[in-house]
Amino acid sequence: PGNGCLVLNRTDSNEKDVIAGMEEFIRKFMQMNPEEAAAASQKAWEISRIANWNTLFSYYSEAYRFALEKSEERRDQPRDYTRILEATEVQVRKPFQAPVWKDIYVQSELPERIAYLKELSSNLWWSWNSEAEFLFRRMDPTLWEEVGHNPKRLLEAIDYKRLVVLADDEVFLDDSDRIYREFTEYLARPENRELPSVAYFSMEFGIHPSLKIYSGGLGVLAGDYLKEASDSNVDITGIGLLYRYGYFRQKLGPKGEQQAIYEAEDFSQIPVEPVKDGNGNHLTIQLTWPGRTVKARLWLAPVGKVKLYLLDTDFEDNTHEDRAITHYLYGGDSENRLKQELILGIGGMRALIALGIKPDVYHSNEGHSAFIGFERMRHLIEDEHLTFEESMEIIRASTLFTTHTPVPAGHDAFEEDLLRKYISHYHTRLNITWDQLMALGRCQDDYERKFNMSFLATRFSQEMNGVSQLHGHVSRGLFSRLWPGYLRDELYIGHVTNGVHYSTWVAPEWEQVYEKLTGKRHFDLCDREQWAKIYQLEDEKVYETKMKLKKRLFDNIRKRLQSDMLERHVSPRTLMNISSHLNEKALTIAFARRFATYKRASLLFRDLDRL
């Protein structure tokens, strides 16, 4: 009271505190002696002379200007949720009791003597071991075709009486014991700790048709990459998405038009298993999006010694819209594609952290997973307290980017407004402006000004490669505008020619030829002496083996033609006419690519005279 005034902080909810403060102030003033009261009154009068609008308005204007500046800064930031006041709990009587549905899985038991077949069927190692695949096929050849060459479904559907017969078949047991022994010895090989560990991110993995998470060459390369890593004992962890419908199965309609057939996948019948947390619950990661949190479950697909972790959003914790994110490979509109790539990149990084995996190198197979750079940088800045520039150096030094597409149309690009909807908060976490964030995925002379995922992946990578020598040359031209003033051949974009996984793509007939030639059951690709023996093969043997395989190919084509044409109600006369003109001795040219526009299928007819 001696100062002549009291300042009370008044809000909408502290009325009692304000009243108590005023009462206390008045009480103390009344207890003053006359001299103290006179001095306090004099100070109060002096304060009243300066507390007028002529003096205070300048401060009011300054406060208003400051508020406008802060409002402008918050424009690019996600809005805070409104503070919710606690209210008295209200009991709402439900008109009915909603049923609670739970999944129940019934597992068939195998005879103890061949119980290890369940373990063998759960690891995709069988998909590139021809003897293991033939072992499952011979259990029931007809059923094997019906279940789509899926041993997990085979063991669920096969008649138990047949299993009992097999468990007493000495020839079958000798073969199955030997194959299982090879499998366990394969997995027991000590890991090679001298090479760096790698996290391999890809939108698709082509490992086997029973796991429908691929559509073309990019996925097949990724699948072969993991298989070869397993064979070579390299420490690689795969990160991808698990799709409910995957890519469509193509059929031809009555008029020859394409029909896309989507078939929902039952995750309990494919070679994946849920990843559990410490409490035995399905492990999930989450991303915060506008007004909601999206969760993704983790699944493990063992690929020999390599672990492939797959994420999916199709479960009850998510909204109907978000459950559909991982329904289709490359499905939906541009916004759904962005969601998929956020799940793959940011969600994939959070999955690695949840699993306790700390790779030395991060490999992006195409630009779909480029958001891993944002999430890694956020971690380095927020948790390791590094600057943006320091974080960029660390990320670039440990990131590799493989590009596949030689034309601009094949590279994903998104509108700025769409990105602002989902990652508007990231620039503040990286201590940069929104424009600086956008510049990471743009080119200065890009008239569309879209955010290009391949540009982002390029800027986050120290090494970048095409998939052939020619493609490397084309890619240097395609990305050269990111570095104006440099010559094409001065760029750090190289090439690694695509290869294939030997055991997946070499037919058993050729394996028998190589075994007879080298005297060894398995052809060692790193043994130059074995390669030298290839030149000892007689031309007749090469031609004979090739024609044997070609005949098998044409038999399969006739079989598929018959099945497809009967469904289209094609006349038997037409079917017989087509089948009779298929000649395995004729030169046959096939176009084994998807008919997407940027694939340029019209190149087939570019030189008709030569064709």
Give, region by region, the residue ranges found by the protein language model.
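Catalytic cores of carbohydrate-active enzymes across secretory and cytosolic contexts
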Residues: 1-611
